[in-house]
Protein backbone atom coordinates (compact mmCIF):
# COMPACT_ATOMS: atom_id res chain seq x y z
CA UNK A 1 0.00 0.00 0.00
CA UNK A 2 2.84 2.39 0.90
CA UNK A 3 4.62 1.72 -2.41
CA UNK A 4 1.46 2.46 -4.38
CA UNK A 5 1.09 5.86 -2.69
CA UNK A 6 4.72 6.82 -3.41
CA UNK A 7 4.35 5.81 -7.07
CA UNK A 8 1.18 7.91 -7.41
CA UNK A 9 2.88 10.96 -5.80
CA UNK A 10 5.85 10.78 -8.19
CA UNK A 11 3.51 10.53 -11.16
CA UNK A 12 1.63 13.66 -10.10
CA UNK A 13 4.86 15.63 -9.59
CA UNK A 14 6.16 14.62 -13.00
CA UNK A 15 2.89 15.65 -14.63
CA UNK A 16 3.05 19.10 -12.93
CA UNK A 17 6.64 19.67 -14.12
CA UNK A 18 5.67 18.74 -17.67
CA UNK A 19 2.79 21.23 -17.68
CA UNK A 20 5.07 24.02 -16.36
CA UNK A 21 7.67 23.30 -19.06
CA UNK A 22 5.00 23.38 -21.79
CA UNK A 23 3.56 26.68 -20.48
CA UNK A 24 7.00 28.29 -20.29
CA UNK A 25 7.75 27.19 -23.82
CA UNK A 26 4.63 28.93 -25.09
CA UNK A 27 5.95 32.35 -23.77
CA UNK A 28 9.59 31.92 -24.95
CA UNK A 29 10.72 34.10 -27.90
CA UNK A 30 12.67 32.87 -30.87
CA UNK A 31 16.28 33.85 -31.45
CA UNK A 32 19.39 34.27 -29.26
CA UNK A 33 20.58 37.17 -27.17
CA UNK A 34 23.35 39.26 -28.84
CA UNK A 35 26.81 39.33 -27.24
CA UNK A 36 27.54 42.16 -24.76
CA UNK A 37 29.09 45.13 -26.55
CA UNK A 38 31.42 46.05 -23.69
CA UNK A 39 32.22 42.92 -21.73
CA UNK A 40 34.20 43.41 -18.55
CA UNK A 41 37.86 43.11 -19.44
CA UNK A 42 40.99 43.49 -17.36
CA UNK A 43 43.25 45.05 -20.00
CA UNK A 44 45.83 46.08 -17.40
CA UNK A 45 46.69 45.27 -13.83
CA UNK A 46 48.98 48.20 -12.98
CA UNK A 47 50.43 51.45 -14.32
CA UNK A 48 53.67 49.72 -15.25
CA UNK A 49 51.81 47.66 -17.87
CA UNK A 50 50.56 50.78 -19.69
CA UNK A 51 52.45 52.85 -22.29
CA UNK A 52 54.18 56.07 -21.28
CA UNK A 53 51.84 58.93 -20.31
CA UNK A 54 49.06 56.41 -19.62
CA UNK A 55 47.65 55.03 -16.37
CA UNK A 56 45.74 51.84 -15.54
CA UNK A 57 42.25 53.11 -14.66
CA UNK A 58 39.03 51.38 -13.66
CA UNK A 59 36.04 51.53 -16.00
CA UNK A 60 33.51 50.36 -13.44
CA UNK A 61 33.60 46.96 -15.14
CA UNK A 62 37.27 46.17 -15.53
CA UNK A 63 40.42 48.23 -16.05
CA UNK A 64 42.01 49.85 -19.09
CA UNK A 65 45.00 52.07 -19.96
CA UNK A 66 43.99 55.71 -20.35
CA UNK A 67 45.88 58.95 -21.08
CA UNK A 68 46.92 61.03 -18.08
CA UNK A 69 45.50 64.59 -18.20
CA UNK A 70 48.32 66.97 -19.20
CA UNK A 71 46.65 70.20 -18.15
CA UNK A 72 46.38 73.44 -20.07
CA UNK A 73 48.97 76.08 -20.87
CA UNK A 74 49.38 79.53 -19.30
CA UNK A 75 49.49 80.40 -15.62
CA UNK A 76 47.00 80.71 -12.78
CA UNK A 77 46.39 84.26 -11.49
CA UNK A 78 47.53 85.31 -8.04
CA UNK A 79 45.19 85.11 -5.07
CA UNK A 80 43.58 88.51 -4.55
CA UNK A 81 41.50 87.78 -1.45
CA UNK A 82 40.76 84.84 0.77
CA UNK A 83 38.28 82.36 -0.65
CA UNK A 84 36.09 79.74 1.00
CA UNK A 85 37.57 76.25 1.08
CA UNK A 86 35.67 74.65 -1.81
CA UNK A 87 36.91 72.41 -4.62
CA UNK A 88 34.96 73.16 -7.76
CA UNK A 89 37.38 71.30 -10.04
CA UNK A 90 40.08 68.63 -9.95
CA UNK A 91 42.04 69.01 -13.20
CA UNK A 92 42.10 71.50 -16.06
CA UNK A 93 40.05 69.09 -18.14
CA UNK A 94 37.14 69.39 -15.71
CA UNK A 95 36.84 73.12 -16.49
CA UNK A 96 34.82 74.50 -19.41
CA UNK A 97 36.42 76.20 -22.41
CA UNK A 98 39.90 77.62 -21.88
CA UNK A 99 39.57 77.91 -18.12
CA UNK A 100 42.19 76.35 -15.85
CA UNK A 101 41.75 74.59 -12.50
CA UNK A 102 43.71 76.85 -10.14
CA UNK A 103 44.44 76.73 -6.42
CA UNK A 104 43.21 79.90 -4.70
CA UNK A 105 44.26 79.61 -1.08
CA UNK A 106 42.44 76.49 0.13
CA UNK A 107 40.02 76.66 -2.79
CA UNK A 108 40.23 75.13 -6.28
CA UNK A 109 38.16 76.80 -8.97
CA UNK A 110 37.96 77.20 -12.75
CA UNK A 111 39.39 80.60 -13.75
CA UNK A 112 40.68 82.23 -16.92
CA UNK A 113 44.49 81.79 -16.98
CA UNK A 114 46.93 84.63 -17.59
CA UNK A 115 49.82 84.65 -20.05
CA UNK A 116 53.44 85.34 -19.18
CA UNK A 117 53.54 87.99 -21.91
CA UNK A 118 51.06 90.07 -19.93
CA UNK A 119 53.23 89.85 -16.82
CA UNK A 120 56.35 90.77 -18.82
CA UNK A 121 54.84 94.16 -19.64
CA UNK A 122 55.39 95.18 -16.02
CA UNK A 123 59.00 93.99 -15.89
CA UNK A 124 58.95 90.49 -14.45
CA UNK A 125 56.63 88.14 -12.63
CA UNK A 126 55.17 88.36 -9.16
CA UNK A 127 56.26 85.61 -6.74
CA UNK A 128 53.71 82.95 -5.95
CA UNK A 129 51.69 83.39 -2.79
CA UNK A 130 53.14 81.51 0.22
CA UNK A 131 50.19 79.13 0.28
CA UNK A 132 49.69 76.67 1.80
CA UNK A 133 51.14 77.95 5.08
CA UNK A 134 54.92 77.66 5.12
CA UNK A 135 57.46 77.93 7.93
CA UNK A 136 60.25 79.85 6.14
CA UNK A 137 62.28 80.44 9.31
CA UNK A 138 62.81 78.78 12.69
CA UNK A 139 63.88 81.87 14.63
CA UNK A 140 65.69 85.19 14.33
CA UNK A 141 69.01 83.36 14.05
CA UNK A 142 67.88 81.75 10.78
CA UNK A 143 67.23 85.15 9.14
CA UNK A 144 69.76 87.47 7.42
CA UNK A 145 71.25 90.38 9.33
CA UNK A 146 68.70 93.14 9.80
CA UNK A 147 65.77 90.72 9.52
CA UNK A 148 63.55 89.03 12.09
CA UNK A 149 61.50 85.79 11.98
CA UNK A 150 57.90 87.09 12.10
CA UNK A 151 54.47 85.50 11.90
CA UNK A 152 52.51 86.06 8.69
CA UNK A 153 49.24 84.74 10.09
CA UNK A 154 49.84 81.61 8.02
CA UNK A 155 53.36 80.53 8.94
CA UNK A 156 56.55 82.53 9.58
CA UNK A 157 58.98 84.39 7.32
CA UNK A 158 62.01 86.71 7.57
CA UNK A 159 61.05 90.40 7.51
CA UNK A 160 63.40 93.42 7.37
CA UNK A 161 63.20 97.00 8.61
CA UNK A 162 62.82 95.84 12.20
CA UNK A 163 63.04 98.57 14.81
CA UNK A 164 65.96 98.08 17.10
CA UNK A 165 69.31 99.75 17.62
CA UNK A 166 72.55 99.29 19.49
CA UNK A 167 74.08 101.07 22.43
CA UNK A 168 76.63 103.82 22.15
CA UNK A 169 76.84 107.11 20.26
CA UNK A 170 77.94 107.81 16.72
CA UNK A 171 81.33 109.55 16.43
CA UNK A 172 81.62 113.03 14.96
CA UNK A 173 82.31 112.78 11.25
CA UNK A 174 84.37 115.53 9.65
CA UNK A 175 84.06 114.41 6.02
CA UNK A 176 80.60 113.95 4.50
CA UNK A 177 80.11 111.42 1.68
CA UNK A 178 76.76 110.81 -0.01
CA UNK A 179 76.98 107.02 0.20
CA UNK A 180 74.42 104.94 2.06
CA UNK A 181 76.11 101.80 3.36
CA UNK A 182 73.44 100.89 5.91
CA UNK A 183 69.94 101.79 7.04
CA UNK A 184 69.86 100.64 10.66
CA UNK A 185 72.25 99.25 13.26
CA UNK A 186 71.21 95.68 12.51
CA UNK A 187 72.62 96.04 8.99
CA UNK A 188 76.10 96.38 10.48
CA UNK A 189 78.32 93.64 11.82
CA UNK A 190 78.63 93.04 15.52
CA UNK A 191 80.27 95.90 17.40
CA UNK A 192 79.33 98.56 14.81
CA UNK A 193 76.56 101.12 14.53
CA UNK A 194 74.87 102.70 11.49
CA UNK A 195 75.78 106.39 11.71
CA UNK A 196 75.12 109.44 9.55
CA UNK A 197 78.01 110.95 7.65
CA UNK A 198 76.87 114.14 5.98
CA UNK A 199 74.35 112.92 3.41
CA UNK A 200 75.39 109.28 3.75
CA UNK A 201 75.34 106.50 6.33
CA UNK A 202 78.18 104.15 7.32
CA UNK A 203 78.85 101.29 9.73
CA UNK A 204 81.39 102.52 12.31
CA UNK A 205 82.39 101.48 15.83
CA UNK A 206 80.28 103.45 18.33
CA UNK A 207 81.67 105.81 20.94
CA UNK A 208 80.81 104.39 24.33
CA UNK A 209 80.33 106.70 27.33
CA UNK A 210 83.25 106.69 29.77
CA UNK A 211 82.93 104.42 32.73
CA UNK A 212 82.53 106.07 36.12
CA UNK A 213 85.54 105.42 38.33
CA UNK A 214 84.53 104.55 41.86
CA UNK A 215 86.53 106.01 44.74
CA UNK A 216 87.07 103.56 47.59
CA UNK A 217 85.71 106.19 50.01
CA UNK A 218 82.41 106.52 48.11
CA UNK A 219 79.40 104.42 49.06
CA UNK A 220 76.21 103.55 47.18
CA UNK A 221 72.97 104.21 49.07
CA UNK A 222 69.84 102.06 48.86
CA UNK A 223 68.29 104.58 46.42
CA UNK A 224 71.24 104.00 44.02
CA UNK A 225 72.64 107.50 44.70
CA UNK A 226 76.31 108.01 45.41
CA UNK A 227 77.23 109.34 48.82
CA UNK A 228 80.50 111.28 48.63
CA UNK A 229 82.02 112.25 51.98
CA UNK A 230 82.92 115.93 52.37
CA UNK A 231 86.56 116.39 53.45
From Swiss-Prot:
SUPFAM superfamilies registered for this protein in UniProt: Elafin-like
Expression (tissue specificity): Ubiquitously expressed.
Origin: domain of life: Eukaryota
Keyword terms, alphabetized: Disulfide bond, Glycoprotein, Protease inhibitor, Repeat, Secreted, Serine protease inhibitor, Signal
Compartments it resides in: Secreted
GO biological process: antibacterial humoral response; innate immune response
Glycosylation, residue list: 107, 217
Pfam families per record: WAP (PF00095)
PROSITE patterns listed in its UniProt record: WAP
Domain WAP: 26-68, 69-114, 119-162, 163-207
Signal peptide (residue range): 1-24
Disulphide connectivity of cysteines: 33-57, 40-61, 44-56, 50-65, 76-102, 85-106, 89-101, 95-110, 126-150, 133-154, 137-149, 143-158, 170-195, 178-199, 182-194, 188-203
Family matches, as InterPro entries: Elafin-like_sf, WAP_dom, WAP_four-disulfide_core
PANTHER family: WAP FOUR-DISULFIDE CORE DOMAIN PROTEIN 3, WHEY ACDIC PROTEIN WAP
Protein name in UniProt: WAP four-disulfide core domain protein 3
Organism, as annotated: Homo sapiens
Amino acid sequence: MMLSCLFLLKALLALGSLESWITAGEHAKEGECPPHKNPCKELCQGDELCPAEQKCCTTGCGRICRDIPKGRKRDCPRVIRKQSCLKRCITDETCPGVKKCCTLGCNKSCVVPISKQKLAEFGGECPADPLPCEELCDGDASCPQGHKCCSTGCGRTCLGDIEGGRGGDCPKVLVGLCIVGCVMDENCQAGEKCCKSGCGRFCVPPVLPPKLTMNPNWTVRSDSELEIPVP
